[in-house]
Regions:
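Asp-box/WD-like beta-propeller blade repeats and closely related beta-sheet repeat scaffolds
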Residues: 103-187
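A short beta-strand motif characteristic of beta-propeller blades
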Residues: 53-59, 106-111, 173-179, 222-228, ...
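Short loop/turn segments immediately following beta-strands, especially the blade-tip
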Residues: 44-50, 96-103, 143-154, 212-219, ...
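Blade-loop segments of beta-propeller domains
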Residues: 53-123, 127
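Beta-rich, blade/repeat-based domains predominating
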Residues: 34-37, 61-71, 114-125, 166-196, ...
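Short glycine/acidic-enriched loop and turn motifs that connect beta-strands
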Residues: 31-35, 82-86, 136-139, 205-207, ...
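Blade-level signature of beta-propeller repeat domains, shared across WD40, Kelch, NHL, RCC1
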Residues: 353-359, 371-393
Length: 393
């Protein structure tokens, strides 16, 4: 059998060179159980025309279910959503160097996240630390980056700890989903625009936990604030407005979006909550929300509905958190676990986990409505769409 090195060399030789107007886009996947995926895939996307090339295997990885790029360096980070590694409990985050001519990835370092099932990863705006949310473990990890963007080991004890375990305190509480909310389940982690706070959506706790972040020491402090949402909401992902003063949380279990505004405290104040589905959808059995994003121009919000297989479209009303529901657009992809808005804000790409496809939509800059472009490519079990970040974002 050919070696992994030989396979990587062959992939580079077969990879088309990135042309003007094209940007690489990576797709995180599930490799187990029983999928055809071998890791992270890359395609070339034309930000002017919306054309998407056939994907290639960019880097072998196990369950790279979420990806995040460095704000300055050609580095991509992926969680390995697993319960343990090499006989040790806890998942892994892996650092890959990007070949800027092709988008092919080379593994550079990998470290434990200290908890089972990491499902989300992010990099702070200055590119000094990587943070991961451990869904199975109900915890958050902060790992320091070297000057080259490689990962340093997680420190879990003492004053320099970069690890926080969420605590369970909901026994007997009415209104919660006993199957999904049996313990803490950290589902995403985001850094405030200033880089001093970390927001973790915990689906099991129905809270957004706010931790202080020391990027110099790569440490997290215990909970500084806790934003409580409705019982049974199941907060999953957070999208922060470009102004840094507003945010919206997509709630997986009750299929809603909650508006949040900044407060004098480190966290947010809760404003109104609205549905991601039209009122005529009364039977929501088997349906759930997944991803949320604010358009880079700051005028629209989008959220994905699994089972209904649609994207909810909203217009942001003025300088408030109020959302005007514009309707839903079919994703033409089954189980839209994730989507991302392409650089320039003209197109949106949807990952259909169950259909093994990625579909492309054009965004109307005036109304925010989506239009299917007709472009769809095959990617095995896609669950994340990632572009390179702009510096400082």
């Amino acid at each position: 059998m050919p070696s992994i090195r030989a396979a990587c060399v062959a992939a580079v030789l077969l990879s088309p060179t990135i042309q003007a107007g094209e940007v690489p886009v990576w797709f995180g996947t599930y490799t187990t159980p029983k999928t055809a995926s071998e890791g992270i895939y890359v395609a070339l996307f034309d930000t002017d025309t919306g054309m998407l090339s056939k994907p290639l295997l960019a880097g072998r990885a196990k369950n790279p279910s979420f990806l995040a790029s460095h704000p300055r360096l050609p580095m991509l980070y992926a969680v390995a959503e697993i319960a343990g590694n090499d006989g040790k409990p806890g998942g892994v985050v892996e650092a890959f160097e990007i070949d800027e001519a092709t988008g092919i990835l080379a593994s550079r370092s990998a470290e434990s996240t200290g908890g089972a099932g990491p499902c989300h990863v992010t990099v702070d705006p200055e590119g000094r630390v990587v943070l991961a949310a451990n869904y199975g473990g109900g915890s958050v990890a902060c790992l320091r980056l070297t000057a080259d963007g490689w990962l340093e080991p997680l420190v879990m004890t003492g004053s320099a700890s970069g690890f926080v375990q969420h605590e369970w305190d909901r026994s007997g509480e009415p209104g919660i989903d006993l199957k999904r909310q049996d313990k803490p389940h950290a589902h995403s982690v985001d850094v405030s625009p200033g880089g001093f706070s970390v927001f973790t959506c915990d689906l099991g706790l129905d809270r957004i936990q706010v931790h202080g972040l020391d990027r110099e020491r790569a440490t997290l402090n215990p909970v500084r604030d806790s934003v409580r949402l409705a019982p049974g909401a199941g907060p999953r992902h957070l999208a922060i407005h470009p102004d840094g003063e507003r945010a919206w949380c997509v709630n997986e279990l009750n299929l809603t979006v909650t508006g949040l505004r900044s407060s004098v405290r480190p966290g947010f104040l809760v404003d109104e909550t609205c549905s991601t589905l039209p009122p005529e959808v009364t039977d929501r059995t088997g349906l759930s929300c997944a991803e949320i994003a604010v358009h880079p121009h700051g005028k629209f919000v989008y959220a994905s509905n699994r089972g209904h297989d649609s994207l909810a479209m909203f217009r942001i009303v003025g300088d408030t958190t109020h959302l005007e529901f514009l309707g839903t657009e079919p994703t033409r992809a089954k189980t839209p676990r994730h989507f991302a808005i392409a650089p320039g804000g003209k197109f949106l790409l949807v990952a259909g986990q169950a259909s093994n496809t990625v579909t492309v939509f054009a965004i109307d800059p005036e109304t925010g409505r989506l239009r299917f472009t007709g472009t769809s490519i095959e990617v095995p079990s896609p669950v994340c769409v990632a572009f390179r970040r702009s510096p400082g974002t």
